[in-house]
Amino acid sequence: IGALLISSGLFTACDTDFENPNNPTEDVVLGTKEGLFALATGIRQYYSVTALRQVIEAPGITTRELGVTNTFLNINELAKGGAELPGESGGITNPWVNLLRAKGMAESLIEGANTVELSPGTRSGVIAYGNLFKAMSLGALIEMFEQAPINNFADGAAEFSDRATVLANCISLLEEARDMMSSSPVSDEFKSTVLWPEMNLQKTVNAFLSRYYLLAGNYTESITAANAVLNDSDATNSMWVYDANNQNPIWNRTVNSADLNPQTNFGLLGAYVPEAGDGRVNFYLGDDAGFANGDAGGQALSEMLGFFGTNTASIPIYLKGEMLLNKAEAFARQSQLSDAVIQLNLVRQKNDDPLSVNANLPAWTGNETSQADILEEIYKNRCIELFLTGMRFEDSKRFHPNFVVPTAANTTNERNRNYYPYPTVERENNPNTPADPSI
């Protein structure tokens, strides 16, 4: 698998490939069923250990979920944000490079599935799996960057697309995955060789469809996809699983290395501070853990628990609570306020979550006729329920689009950037790199 991961470098947007005579050639990897299965397994390992860290860490620092406890320049630059976050910062280069690599591996898998002779059920499994990983990688990129390349180019000169186009492509990939699995159910061969017991591919595709439909403003479709997850007869919770050799990447950055720690109260201030008795606080956060660096804000920190407390703790690929909150927001934005409050209260009153993310609070007592108030309560619950899922950066921009982010460094606002500048390594190697966003 390691060789496959190394060889995948030739599929990134900027050309960083180095010849290694011990690596299988691209033709060997993509030309056999066994090679495709090995690549699929390699994608899972790379994404869950390497790319997922970047999906969670950079947005988590930008939106005050995580506090910085060392003097490493890259994460301190993220904590300050504003104009002090330069294109050469590793804090934004790492997400860019890692997600492009994961996306390139998925593109190679999809290409191979269309050329290698496979049974219909195996082909649908390989393509659905590849489409899912490409959509996840693209979605994470467009939540951090104003534009992103939909397809990697071998010469490094990938073309960029705007947010709406990228989201539409994510949706198209996932719709194709959903429809292929419906017309040609995934084969037992693919399930037993590539998938793992904690993975329901169909539910996961629908969960990400619900997410990206919501971001694109396709509210009815988001509700339908969320219902497909919530009403699925299979109780499997799709999880990234870890062992001693492939360790939980957020545990590794918090508990193990203490470079970062969760901010107390999830970094929320004022009206967004969790209510007394909210069970999600004690699920995710432990005892007081000191303070962040003064230059990074000096915020109060807590011990890491939840899905990141041990080196082998599994991380959910999506949460049931996200599906409920997606429905709540979609109803609210369509002015179906009573339906929105019903879904919101399902989250607030939840005490039987399959992964123990239980607020166990009473029903909301706010103004049920105010769309603005309902949306604010949904935002607050997304910040708590979906802690360290990589979603808060996107959520902050969607719920508070008129918030003016200062150009000066800031460690107290709910976000200190709207989008990241494009990494210098991309700009120096790709003439198609757009101008940086203003903030």
Predicted regions and their residues:
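Aromatic-residue-lined binding/catalytic grooves and analogous aromatic/hydrophobic interfacial grooves
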Residues: 14-15, 171-184, 202-241
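Conserved, well-structured interaction surfaces
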Residues: 37, 73-145, 155, 159-164, ...
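Hydrophobic-face positions in mid-chain alpha helices that act as interaction patches
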Residues: 75-79, 217-324, 351-364, 371, ...
